[in-house]
Amino acid sequence: MKRFRIICAVVAVIALLYGCSGNSFESPAGLADNPKAIPVETESPETELPATIAPTDPPEPTIPPLGAGTGSHILSYYSDEYEDYLDYYIHVPKDAVAGMPLMVFLHGDGEVSRLDLIPEGGISMIANEIYGESFPFILLEPNTRIESWTKGNIPKLLFELVNAVADEYCVNTDKIILTGFSRGAIGVWDMISIYGGYFSAAVPVSSPHQKGHIDYIKAAEVPVWTFAGNIGDIERWYHQYLAQNVDIINGCGGFGKFTVLHGCNHVQAKNAAYIEETFEWMLAQERGVIPEG
């Protein structure tokens, strides 16, 4: 019995020395399943954070991967509210970034229901001659299927399209420009009569408002520069109305300017009006800011 006790004591000492040596050993079978086993909690050392974090420059914002992306595209916009659609041509510069101006051009009768003619009949080719492929703006050219920009829900549908494109391409909402030629110019007058200061600049070329009446108070919220040629009865007839329009806009505290394009008939007036000076003026305007005389 005494010998048995000595053996047990020796075994206990050996086990104690083995456990303190830092070597691992396997637990006896069943110990891990023992519900009375108490887990040993270990504390992880706290990580000391730096007092300040060096600021980093935010990445340059880019166009989100929505819609058609960069380049020139022919697309269609459908409105659930009005159950109608507008086809449109859009040019997004290849180096486009968020915050670019948006220029909206309304065509004349020659392109009605002819979306395929928009690239040549609009102003994209003119802009390309001035700026090359890298426009300093996104160009939107909607296409109407009837000879009007003012009938029915077209103004509301057009406004909805402009808003959708502005949101999709993250444009600078303080630089949304509206311009148009001939019947498109009538649409410009109509749109600024309804939405006024939503736009940063308005340039109607070769046409006053069809009805000879606009909401001058609303139109005075946006700077207006209008043009007309001086060859042909139609162009000369426009002069009295356009001059009257800008005079009243100026009288309402707005900015109105009328330029006669000497030596130009109705068709020639478009190329004469859309020159680099005109584009730069449009791009320089900001929503809610009326330039000085």
Residue ranges and their predicted role:
Residues 20-102, 179-181, 191, 244-256, ...:
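A domain-start/cap signature at the N-terminus of enzymes
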Residues 94-98, 147-182:
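Gly/Ser-rich "nucleophile elbow"/oxyanion-hole loop immediately N-terminal to the catalytic nucleophile
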Residues 117-130, 161, 206-217, 240-245:
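Alpha-helical scaffolding within the catalytic cores
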